[in-house]
Amino acid sequence: MKFGKIFKKQMVPEWVEAYVDYNGLKRVLKEIRSYKHSKLTRAASRVSQQAEALHRSFSGLSFHPRHSERAGDIEDQVIKVDTVQEEGSRKLYETKFLKKSEEGGEFEESFFKKLDENLNKVNKFYRDKVKEVIEEAALLDKQMDALIALRVKMQKPDVDNLNLEKHPSDKVVVDTSDNTMRTQGTANTDMVHGIERTNIPEEEASHIMADIVPVSHTNGDEEEASIGDKQDLREILERVKMNDVLESPITTLKGVFGDSNEPISKKGLKKGEEQLRLVFSEFYQKLRRLKEYSFMNLLAFSKIMKKYEKIASRNASRNYMKIVDNSLIGSSDEVNRLLERVEVTFVKHFSSGNRREGMKCLRPKVKRERHRVTFFSGFFSGCSIALVIAVVFKIESRKIMEKNYGTEYMANIIPLYSLFGFIILHMLMYSANIYFWKRYRVNYTFIFGFKQGTELGDREVFLVSTGLAVLAFVCFLLNLQLDMDWRMKHHKTLPEVIPLCLATIVLFILFCPFNIIYRSSRFFFIRSLFHCICAPLYEVTLPDFFLGDHLTSQIQAIRSFELFICYYGLGEYLQRQNKCHSHGVYNAFYFVVAVIPYWLRFLQCIRRLCEEKESVHGYNALKYMLTIIAVIVRTAYELKKGRTWMILALVSSGVATGMNTFWDIVIDWGLLRKHSKNPYLRDKLLVPHKSVYFAAMVVNVILRVAWMQLVLEFNLKSLHKIAVTSIISCLEIIRRGIWSFFRLENEHLNNVGKYRAFKSVPHPFHYYDDDDVDKDD
């Protein structure tokens, strides 16, 4: 694999703009090569024209560049790199190309100008990130002081006077100038040059580099100073307060109606330890990514300079790489030292000194694709197609629809099985979304907050959906077979129980506590669903409101679940007739069920409005309130009919549809920006074909309008009406799948613009500094 592809693959998606523009530099080199090639072609033709005249004096003369034989002697005269000092001890590099007067020199000058821009950009980004992690390390020092003090207090409650000594490696000097961050040991650049000499494949080299953490060396003075740092236990405990890192409805209500401060218990300390483990793990991943960022950029500079030497026939690589080696990204050793400190601290305090167990937590294994997943996905999809054909043939061969009871029979069982059809279609759309997110490098695992190594890929989701499809079609086929079998005429209620058994199996798999069938993903879904149901008592995160939006597209599935409760709970299956609409309670819940998803999203928006104080959440809440009104009026029309209800349903649905469509395209997708680089789209697009975005907007409008068709009076039979309702519900699920891709694309681009590549894990302890005390006074 070429380095350009490996370089792109190894990038942190949210930091793409901060990397060396390797492809841009290659384009400049192509211009230089094209010019050199045309120059050599002209020179060769000139030589051939003079061949006869020169033949009598010089036999076999060939063209040679004038100064090529002495290129090695004038290497130092090709470029001159100056350092410009800026405020805050920051350095900028400026390269002067000394051969500008030569023919084609302006191309090479533009190459070095672009190279300097990339070097300065990379150094600036690296400097800012190193400053950020050093400050974060200082905060983690205070968190560890608090944890150790609380552990001692819990083990020995009577001890008040105890000095906590810090490990020599815990000393951190928060000085982010270029001079202090640069050390004598240039481990990264030495490693890069070693890889260049040994010809190790770049992809393998990047993994080697990420796994090696050089041992930092601390001078004697620094070590002596840090050993002398001692803190009193009582002083620390007086400054520490436990944060509510694991929010629950109880803690939320306590925060609203009273003081949530409570004495720290052993249970609370245990939760704090678990939270601090997550903080250290996330911090370690950030350090590793920063180390990989440094290494890959150094490798990119080395590769591009080798290409320049080959194309321009100039030996400028050594001089320029010396500058790169001495720059911040090539010489700073702060990240390596922090990596070592985190490993030592984590192993000592969170793994009982067991380094192997500690490193397993800090470096979770990368998830590998399994061939059996692909095999069973194909197997189940093939079985699903075969079962669909079998169902169609069964209905046709028994001529069910031509019999008197056939229509009524299908009208009874189709709503029951449609629940599973909606779920399967939704999962298939989610599988397609994951495939395209991965293809266009949308970091969906970070956006959703999935734990590394446990996230489901597109093939796993496809496997689950096709497996459920096989199960549903087998049950449906079995239902048909038993109903039509003359031997079962005395046990007519037995086939009616099959949909209930299928629903029980699905619920058992979903809530199964054993570590089978992707337990971590199932529990993540259950937790997000519970947060949605308990809105606004939980802090609203992206997975929560994303799931809430998807629930609004599953109104018909929720109503099918309500039908399950009525059909089996009230004993309707014993009469083999669906008369649930004759029950007043069912009709009341028929209203409520349609409103619940929108109401939950409304409450989530109100919670975010109160916390973030941003007006956009207020407008979003208004949008859901209008949708709630439209759904209520439409449901009332569906039950009561009448021209007045029809007009009210059309007006309310039209207003809600218009606002929802505008919100989808402009707010959620970030499109229709009139003055953007891409007219009527947005500045940054991940999909290279602009027509895809315009097509998606048109399809979204059409499918948004489709649900209004339910308001119109078609005078359809019961079965046909069920079919139309199911088709429109399927179209809404497809629309939601399309919406999901562009919604996460826009979220990813927002993260890219802010270089936000890691989730912020809340610290378990709040440590009061002297500055905080002064502010309180």
From Swiss-Prot:
Segments in the Cytoplasmic topological domain: 1-372, 430-459, 518-646, 713-777
Membrane-protein topology: Multi-pass membrane protein
Transmembrane segments: 373-393, 409-429, 460-480, 497-517, 647-667, 692-712
All residue ranges annotated as the EXS domain in the record: 581-775
Stated role: May transport inorganic phosphate (Pi).
PANTHER family reported in the protein's UniProt record: PHOSPHATE TRANSPORTER PHO1 HOMOLOG 10 (PTHR10783:SF104), XENOTROPIC AND POLYTROPIC RETROVIRUS RECEPTOR 1-RELATED (PTHR10783)
Annotated family: Belongs to the SYG1 (TC 2.A.94) family.
Protein name per Swiss-Prot or TrEMBL: Phosphate transporter PHO1 homolog 10
Organism per entry: Arabidopsis thaliana (Mouse-ear cress)
